[in-house]
Regions:
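Active-site beta-strand/loop signature of hydrolases that rely on acidic residues for catalysis
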Residues: 1-21, 48-49, 116, 126-135, ...
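Short, hinge-like loop/turn segments at secondary-structure boundaries
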Residues: 20-22, 65-69, 149, 180-181
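Acidic, His/Gly-rich catalytic cores of divalent-metal-dependent hydrolytic chemistry
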Residues: 194-197, 201-207
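Active-site catalytic loop in hydrolytic enzyme cores
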Residues: 55-128, 139-147, 153
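Beta-strand C-termini and the immediately following turn/loop, strongest in propeller blades
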Residues: 52-54, 167-168
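Short acidic-glycine loop/turn motifs at beta-strand connectors
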Residues: 56, 67-71, 181-184, 202-204
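CN hydrolase (nitrilase-like) catalytic-core segments centered on the catalytic cysteine
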Residues: 26-47, 118-197
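Short beta-strand scaffold segments in enzyme catalytic cores
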Residues: 50-52, 62-66, 100, 176-180, ...
């Protein structure tokens, strides 16, 4: 499965917090954009996990969808409110209320989006694999001087095997990075500011 970061599809700063504008940026699960993504998973035989800005009727969410073999396997909506400028937003900008696992090729997986794992770690405490798409703008110096250790520690509050994905971006600058935390420490990673794919074997995550 190819895993991408939070709000990767449109970009984390794609919203202006004016619903009349933002409703055209968000996409629903039946949109042509999502249909194309689903079709790619069937064409290439690879599942895809991506963060996106979701439209559901008249409500907008920061969501994360999983596609495999041309179908939607799972759609998770962020439960913490830090994705939005909540002093500017109205009832149209919403959070999800449900966490839960899904099964992909025999493996149980959960998703937490960025601040979810900081605000509600108790809702993600499972023994199986956790995928944690984020969007954060720390400098490499900050990451290397304690921030990465903080994220590793927070991942451990939820589970013993976590994959964290942070997208590269130029405006605002995000230095990217992908990491695997196992029982606390980082066991493999992509360096900051490098466009690359971190390949991990998660067959043991459920054992």
């Amino acid at each position: 499965m190819l895993c991408l970061g939070e709000a990767f599809l449109q970009g984390f700063d794609s919203l202006c917090w004016n619903y009349a504008v933002d409703q055209h940026m968000a996409v629903d699960l039946q949109s042509d954009t999502i249909r194309r993504l689903r079709s790619l998973t069937a064409r290439y035989g690879t599942a895809l996990l991506t963060g996106y800005i979701e439209m559901d009727r008249d409500r907008i969410y920061s969501s994360c969808a999983v596609f495999e073999s041309g179908r939607t396997v799972h759609n998770y909506r962020r439960i913490s409110r830090g994705w939005k400028e909540y002093t500017k937003t109205d009832r149209h900008y919403c959070e999800g209320t449900v966490t839960g696992e899904f099964t992909l090729r025999g493996q149980r997986i959960m998703i937490a989006l960025c601040g979810d794992l900081w605000d509600y770690p108790e809702r993600f405490r499972k023994e199986h694999l956790l995928i944690w798409p984020v969007y954060v703008n720390y400098t490499p110096e900050d990451w290397n001087n304690g921030v990465l250790d903080d994220y590793a520690g927070q991942a451990l509050t939820a589970g013993r095997d976590t994959l964290m994905v942070n997208p590269l971006d130029t405006d605002p600058v995000s230095h990217g990075g992908a990491f695997r935390f196992q029982n606390g420490p980082v066991t493999c990673r992509i360096p900051f500011d490098r466009e690359d794919v971190l390949i991990v074997d998660t067959e043991q995550a459920d054992r």
